[in-house]
Amino acid sequence: ISSDFGFTPSIPFFQVIDDTKDVQFDLYKYQYRGAALKTNYRQLWDQSAFQASIYTARVETYKAEREAVGAIDALFTSNIGNNWDINARLVRSSQDTFLRRYKFNTETSLKSSATAERILSDHYYFVEGSDWQSLTTANKNTNEPTILPHIFYEKTQKGWRPQQQLRSEISALQL
């Protein structure tokens, strides 16, 4: 019970779809502010996993008494080819305050990204592209950079002396 939201019951429903998939629905009814649904979906494969949280609501925001809002936080991970770890994360919101106000997420910015990483005994590869969404009222053009791509390569090798080791690094960044 809260003076802002009133009485807030939350009812979870859990469904196992099969051996590798499940979903959970959490319904929220805010006595004074509307209703929300949080859906968590998970799925596994041999070398991959997917997990998504989807938020939908018709709640009071600072802009409107009952505004239809939504957000997603999805993550896909996989190990492909010759030991490449792939991660893709999508985090977006249709409105800048409802995630914090209704305690779904406390962040003031959301970062979506795709990365590929490979680690060998003497080499390291990393590639990333990302996009930021600002959840503040400040100038969004400076707080929402898109980085495509960021590439980092590192190689280690023996030096000229017995205990010496050489490391070469190459890094490139595109804003």
Per-region residue spans from a language model:
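Outer-membrane beta-barrel proteins and related beta-barrel translocases across Gram-negative bacteria
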Residues: 1-175
